[in-house]
């Protein structure tokens, strides 16, 4: 049905308490990053937002996040999913806290929604009032900046973005100089 929450699923969430030096080097970890949290899910955009939430809630950084582009319904194995994210932190407790936030956000937070009755046209329109370190870096914005994250069919996304920007400027929420569109 229209406006159905389509949801996302965590497929795997694992913790490495004391990362191997070789793996740490290949991930270009900082010296204080001793523990890793690794997560896969069936939805990349939701996972990126969830990873960013973890950077605000725990002493962790996103050190790797990549879409595998198999698609949510086309994962190559049961645990592979569409995306992998890796958090790094100083100890297992911080990383576990970060992973807990990621899992919660994927399962209960940001989501794709249906734009039509048979759920065949999904869209993702999520407002982040205060971006953490991960999304602010990706948006080339200061940490704490508000970000609108929009994924939709291309033409509809552009029309929606135009309407949202016009409304935000008209209401005084921002001015044209403060807006960055990242494609």
Where do the language-model regions lie?
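N-terminal basic/disordered segments at the start of proteins
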Residues: 1-22
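Conserved mixed alpha/beta catalytic, RNA-binding, or beta-rich assembly cores of soluble enzyme
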Residues: 16-32, 39-51, 55-72, 76-89, ...
């Amino acid at each position: 049905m229209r406006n159905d929450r389509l949801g996302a699923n965590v497929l795997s969430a694992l913790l490495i308490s004391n990362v191997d030096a070789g793996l740490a080097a290949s991930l270009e970890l900082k010296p204080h990053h001793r523990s890793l949290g690794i997560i896969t899910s069936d939805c990349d955009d939701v996972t990126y937002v969830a990873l960013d939430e973890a950077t605000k809630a725990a002493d962790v950084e996103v050190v790797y996040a990549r879409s595998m582009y198999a698609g949510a319904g086309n994962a190559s194995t049961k645990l592979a999913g569409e995306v992998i994210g890796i958090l790094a932190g100083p100890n297992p407790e911080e990383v576990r806290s970060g992973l807990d936030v990621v899992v919660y956000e994927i399962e209960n937070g940001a989501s794709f929604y249906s734009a039509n009755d048979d759920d065949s046209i999904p869209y993702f329109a999520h407002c982040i009032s205060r971006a953490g370190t991960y999304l602010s870096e990706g948006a080339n914005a200061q940490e704490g900046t508000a970000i609108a994250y929009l994924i939709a069919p291309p033409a509809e996304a552009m029309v929606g973005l135009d309407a949202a920007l016009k409304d935000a400027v008209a209401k005084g929420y921002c001015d044209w100089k403060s807006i960055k569109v990242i494609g």
